Amino acid sequence: NCYLITNGLGGYSSLTMTGAAARGDHAFFMACTEAPNHRYNMIQRLEEQITVNGKSYIFSTQEYADGSRQEGYRYLSEFSFEDTPVWRFHINGVEIEKEAVMRQGENTIAVCWRVMNRTRSYACLAVTPYFRFAEKGQDICAGQTYKRYEAEECSGYSAGRIESGGLS
């Protein structure tokens, strides 16, 4: 089973309910520059990890071509999809809620993580986006580079912009 959210321009976010990119058209953020078929896979997937009291747990899910896999679904306690997809994970006394939304009429996606730490231990969340910036169905170009622009912090949230090959 998969979720699908759209932006009204032909862009979308669609992965399995566990957050894996299992099909060729899966992407966390697929932008559309010209409807209906000029789509670019901007962010393939997210790798998510929480460190609690010095021990790290990957709670993202993905199976790779070489047979290796991330089994974050083992920590997934709930997935719901009313207006937006929401995931809840429980890891050693820490609850993590993730919600993704797309802005209508724009090639923009936002994701929010809420970490409720019920332990007295230090917890640190790390998220690694797997950027592609490639046409839908195409591989990343050899030598492709990315440039990161920092934005100021807004209401306690970090923001920024990534650019590659004229796409941003």
Predicted segments — roles?
Residues 1-168:
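Terminal accessory carbohydrate-recognition/targeting modules of carbohydrate-active enzymes
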